[in-house]
Protein backbone atom coordinates (compact mmCIF):
# COMPACT_ATOMS: atom_id res chain seq x y z
CA UNK A 1 0.00 0.00 0.00
CA UNK A 2 2.82 2.42 0.76
CA UNK A 3 3.75 3.28 -2.87
CA UNK A 4 0.11 4.17 -3.63
CA UNK A 5 -0.17 6.26 -0.48
CA UNK A 6 3.02 8.13 -1.37
CA UNK A 7 1.75 8.83 -4.90
CA UNK A 8 -1.59 10.12 -3.60
CA UNK A 9 -0.01 12.21 -0.88
CA UNK A 10 2.58 13.69 -3.22
CA UNK A 11 -0.22 14.56 -5.67
CA UNK A 12 -1.78 16.83 -3.05
CA UNK A 13 -4.32 14.70 -1.16
CA UNK A 14 -5.68 16.32 2.01
CA UNK A 15 -5.89 12.96 3.76
CA UNK A 16 -5.75 9.29 2.90
CA UNK A 17 -8.82 7.08 3.22
CA UNK A 18 -8.09 3.41 3.76
CA UNK A 19 -11.45 1.82 3.01
CA UNK A 20 -13.12 -1.56 2.75
CA UNK A 21 -10.68 -3.00 5.32
CA UNK A 22 -11.85 -6.58 5.89
CA UNK A 23 -9.72 -7.13 8.99
CA UNK A 24 -8.17 -5.38 11.95
CA UNK A 25 -4.73 -6.61 10.91
CA UNK A 26 -4.95 -4.96 7.48
CA UNK A 27 -6.22 -1.74 9.06
CA UNK A 28 -3.28 -1.71 11.49
CA UNK A 29 -0.82 -2.13 8.60
CA UNK A 30 -2.46 0.74 6.72
CA UNK A 31 -2.51 2.93 9.81
CA UNK A 32 1.17 2.18 10.33
CA UNK A 33 1.93 3.49 6.84
CA UNK A 34 0.08 6.75 7.45
CA UNK A 35 1.52 7.19 10.94
CA UNK A 36 5.01 6.50 9.61
CA UNK A 37 4.52 9.24 7.03
CA UNK A 38 2.91 11.58 9.58
CA UNK A 39 -0.19 12.19 7.45
CA UNK A 40 -3.91 12.43 8.33
CA UNK A 41 -6.10 9.44 7.44
CA UNK A 42 -9.37 7.60 7.93
CA UNK A 43 -9.91 3.87 8.36
CA UNK A 44 -13.16 2.29 7.13
CA UNK A 45 -14.09 -1.36 7.64
CA UNK A 46 -16.27 -3.67 5.57
CA UNK A 47 -18.52 -5.77 7.78
CA UNK A 48 -20.41 -9.04 7.44
CA UNK A 49 -23.13 -8.19 9.98
CA UNK A 50 -23.98 -5.69 12.70
CA UNK A 51 -20.97 -6.49 14.82
CA UNK A 52 -18.04 -8.00 12.90
CA UNK A 53 -15.61 -7.15 10.14
CA UNK A 54 -15.71 -9.37 7.07
CA UNK A 55 -12.99 -11.60 8.51
CA UNK A 56 -14.82 -11.86 11.83
CA UNK A 57 -13.20 -9.46 14.30
CA UNK A 58 -15.72 -7.75 16.60
CA UNK A 59 -15.99 -4.09 15.59
CA UNK A 60 -15.51 -3.11 19.26
CA UNK A 61 -12.06 -4.73 19.18
CA UNK A 62 -11.19 -2.60 16.15
CA UNK A 63 -12.37 0.54 17.92
CA UNK A 64 -10.39 -0.29 21.07
CA UNK A 65 -7.25 -0.58 18.95
CA UNK A 66 -7.76 2.75 17.21
CA UNK A 67 -8.89 4.53 20.36
CA UNK A 68 -5.22 4.44 21.41
CA UNK A 69 -4.72 8.06 20.39
CA UNK A 70 -1.04 8.13 21.39
CA UNK A 71 -0.42 5.27 18.94
CA UNK A 72 -2.64 6.70 16.16
CA UNK A 73 -2.48 10.50 16.52
CA UNK A 74 -3.09 11.15 12.80
CA UNK A 75 -6.28 9.09 12.58
CA UNK A 76 -9.13 11.53 11.92
CA UNK A 77 -12.17 9.28 11.54
CA UNK A 78 -13.24 5.64 11.57
CA UNK A 79 -16.00 4.16 9.48
CA UNK A 80 -17.86 1.35 7.78
CA UNK A 81 -18.37 0.95 4.03
CA UNK A 82 -19.16 -1.74 1.48
CA UNK A 83 -21.66 -3.23 3.95
CA UNK A 84 -25.41 -3.86 3.73
CA UNK A 85 -27.36 -0.85 5.07
CA UNK A 86 -29.41 -3.00 7.47
CA UNK A 87 -26.29 -3.51 9.63
CA UNK A 88 -25.12 0.10 9.81
CA UNK A 89 -27.17 1.43 12.76
CA UNK A 90 -25.98 -1.36 15.05
CA UNK A 91 -22.40 -0.91 13.87
CA UNK A 92 -22.54 2.82 14.62
CA UNK A 93 -23.87 2.14 18.12
CA UNK A 94 -21.14 -0.39 18.81
CA UNK A 95 -18.42 1.88 17.43
CA UNK A 96 -19.65 4.96 19.31
CA UNK A 97 -19.74 2.96 22.57
CA UNK A 98 -15.93 2.69 22.35
CA UNK A 99 -14.50 5.47 20.20
CA UNK A 100 -14.33 9.22 20.64
CA UNK A 101 -13.49 9.61 16.94
CA UNK A 102 -16.12 10.71 14.42
CA UNK A 103 -17.77 7.81 12.59
CA UNK A 104 -18.40 7.75 8.83
CA UNK A 105 -20.76 5.32 7.10
CA UNK A 106 -21.21 4.72 3.40
CA UNK A 107 -22.88 1.37 2.86
CA UNK A 108 -23.94 -0.40 -0.31
CA UNK A 109 -27.29 0.23 -1.98
CA UNK A 110 -29.10 -2.54 -0.15
CA UNK A 111 -28.99 -4.99 -3.02
CA UNK A 112 -27.46 -8.42 -2.40
CA UNK A 113 -24.48 -9.66 -4.41
CA UNK A 114 -24.45 -13.29 -5.53
CA UNK A 115 -20.79 -14.33 -5.92
CA UNK A 116 -21.75 -17.49 -7.82
CA UNK A 117 -23.67 -15.72 -10.59
CA UNK A 118 -21.72 -12.46 -10.14
CA UNK A 119 -24.97 -10.50 -10.15
CA UNK A 120 -26.79 -8.13 -7.80
CA UNK A 121 -30.38 -8.79 -6.68
CA UNK A 122 -32.98 -6.51 -5.15
CA UNK A 123 -34.72 -3.32 -6.11
CA UNK A 124 -34.29 0.30 -5.16
CA UNK A 125 -37.13 1.27 -2.83
CA UNK A 126 -37.69 5.01 -2.94
CA UNK A 127 -37.40 6.55 0.50
CA UNK A 128 -35.80 3.56 2.22
CA UNK A 129 -32.23 4.84 1.98
CA UNK A 130 -33.46 8.18 3.35
CA UNK A 131 -34.97 6.42 6.38
CA UNK A 132 -31.76 4.51 6.95
CA UNK A 133 -29.60 7.63 6.57
CA UNK A 134 -31.71 9.49 9.13
CA UNK A 135 -31.32 6.53 11.50
CA UNK A 136 -27.55 6.60 11.02
CA UNK A 137 -27.36 10.32 11.75
CA UNK A 138 -29.49 9.87 14.87
CA UNK A 139 -27.19 7.03 15.97
CA UNK A 140 -24.21 9.38 15.76
CA UNK A 141 -22.71 9.15 12.27
CA UNK A 142 -20.73 12.27 11.39
CA UNK A 143 -20.48 11.51 7.67
CA UNK A 144 -22.98 9.55 5.56
CA UNK A 145 -22.74 8.47 1.93
CA UNK A 146 -22.91 5.45 -0.35
CA UNK A 147 -20.68 2.68 -1.69
CA UNK A 148 -21.37 -0.17 -4.12
CA UNK A 149 -24.39 0.23 -6.37
CA UNK A 150 -25.45 3.56 -4.88
CA UNK A 151 -26.45 6.18 -7.41
CA UNK A 152 -27.41 9.86 -7.38
CA UNK A 153 -30.89 9.00 -6.04
CA UNK A 154 -29.36 7.43 -2.93
CA UNK A 155 -27.28 10.53 -2.26
CA UNK A 156 -30.33 12.72 -2.84
CA UNK A 157 -32.07 10.72 -0.13
CA UNK A 158 -29.08 11.22 2.19
CA UNK A 159 -29.45 14.96 1.56
CA UNK A 160 -33.15 14.84 2.46
CA UNK A 161 -32.32 12.89 5.62
CA UNK A 162 -29.74 15.52 6.55
CA UNK A 163 -32.33 18.29 6.17
CA UNK A 164 -34.73 16.41 8.46
CA UNK A 165 -31.94 15.70 10.95
CA UNK A 166 -30.82 19.34 11.11
CA UNK A 167 -34.38 20.68 11.40
CA UNK A 168 -35.37 18.61 14.43
Regions found by a protein language model. Give the residues of each.
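Domain-level signal for soluble alpha/beta catalytic cores
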Residues: 1-168
Amino acid sequence: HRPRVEILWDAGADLILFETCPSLEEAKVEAGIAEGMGIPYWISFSCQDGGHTCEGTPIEECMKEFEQREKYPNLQMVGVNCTHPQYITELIRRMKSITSLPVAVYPNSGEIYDPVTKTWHGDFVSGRYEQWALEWMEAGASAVGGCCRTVAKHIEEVSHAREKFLNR
